[in-house]
């Protein structure tokens, strides 16, 4: 595997030898000193050019300059995921030695959005000054409205998890659990970290550093919210998710002076228990579904 120094040398060599490329920046985790360094870090690079057209959808240029990637994605040329259509062209590349470059070929303009960024090359000496704001990565203190909305979204979406299990709709139940419900859980845990660390740390994208900042017992509980595909396992994870969220939310609410809607939590807990125990269907209706649902939780 090529070293980071070798990769940086390659990137700068390509830029220096091409007069159309006027500046180069490095972003992402490699520009952030607070991110732990490892072999999986991407090289998030931007080439600033006057005209993007010659670089647009041109994998032959990529192969000539960087070598043929083992895997290549060109988001701006895809239909499945609508592109941003902002004038930039991205090449996302993984090479045979495992190195990854996310290359953005962009028109000559730069707006400092506060994310860590390093200027690697400025041929004209006119590149705007980059004022790195490290706290851009810190967990942000929520407003009372944002906190309440997170709680409501979390509690509401749990009902879909329960329905999906009861209906034997595994993909749907998993999607609800691991998208809207988990998104809100991770957000609340990030605020919990913020409270404990005075909002001066970053839990990372998707909460990837939560293990570092959460109390160990709470992190163990978080692990228990991930289930297998058996419905019994899913029910246990769903209730653990409910209780973990509630404990974290109470901590955040107390620290920031927000009210926490205990009745809302109680309401979804009672509903989940009704569904789990098969007590919603009128007598004589849905008995077979109820029986199967109970068997799958045993």
Say what each PLM segment does.
Residues 1-19, 27-38, 46-103:
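Metal-dependent nucleotidyltransferase catalytic core
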Residues 31-32, 52, 108-110, 195-196:
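Short, solvent-exposed loop/turn segments at secondary-structure junctions
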Residues 36-39, 115-116, 203:
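Short aromatic-enriched loop/helix-cap "lid" or pocket-rim segments at secondary-structure transitions
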């Amino acid at each position: 595997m090529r070293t980071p120094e070798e990769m940086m040398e390659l990137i700068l060599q390509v830029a220096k030898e091409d007069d159309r490329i006027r500046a180069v920046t490095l972003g992402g985790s490699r520009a952030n000193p607070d991110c732990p360094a490892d072999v999986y870090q991407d090289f998030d690079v931007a080439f600033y050019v006057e005209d993007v057209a010659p670089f647009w959808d041109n994998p032959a240029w990529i192969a000539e300059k960087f070598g043929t990637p083992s895997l290549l994605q060109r988001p701006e040329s895809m239909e499945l995921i609508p592109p941003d259509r902002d004038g930039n062209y991205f090449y996302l590349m993984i090479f045979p030695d495992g190195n990854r470059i996310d290359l953005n070929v962009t028109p000559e303009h730069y707006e400092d959005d506060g994310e860590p960024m390093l200027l690697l090359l400025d041929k004209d000496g006119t590149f705007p000054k980059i004022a790195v704001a490290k706290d851009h990565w810190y967990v942000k203190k929520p407003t009372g409205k944002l906190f309440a909305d997170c709680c409501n979204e979390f509690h509401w979406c749990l009902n879909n998890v329960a329905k999906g299990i009861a209906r034997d709709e595994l993909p749907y139940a998993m999607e609800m659990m691991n998208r809207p419900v988990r998104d809100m859980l991770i957000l609340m845990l990030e605020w919990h970290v913020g409270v404990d660390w005075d909002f001066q740390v970053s839990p990372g994208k998707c909460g990837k550093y939560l293990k570092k900042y959460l109390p160990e017992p709470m992190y163990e509980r978080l692990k228990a919210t991930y289930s297998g595909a058996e419905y019994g396992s899913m029910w246990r994870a769903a209730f653990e998710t409910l209780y973990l969220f509630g404990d974290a939310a109470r901590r955040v609410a107390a620290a920031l002076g927000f009210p926490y809607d205990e009745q809302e939590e109680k309401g979804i807990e009672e509903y989940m228990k009704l569904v789990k125990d098969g007590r919603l269907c009128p007598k004589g209706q849905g008995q077979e579904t109820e029986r199967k649902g109970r068997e799958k939780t045993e």
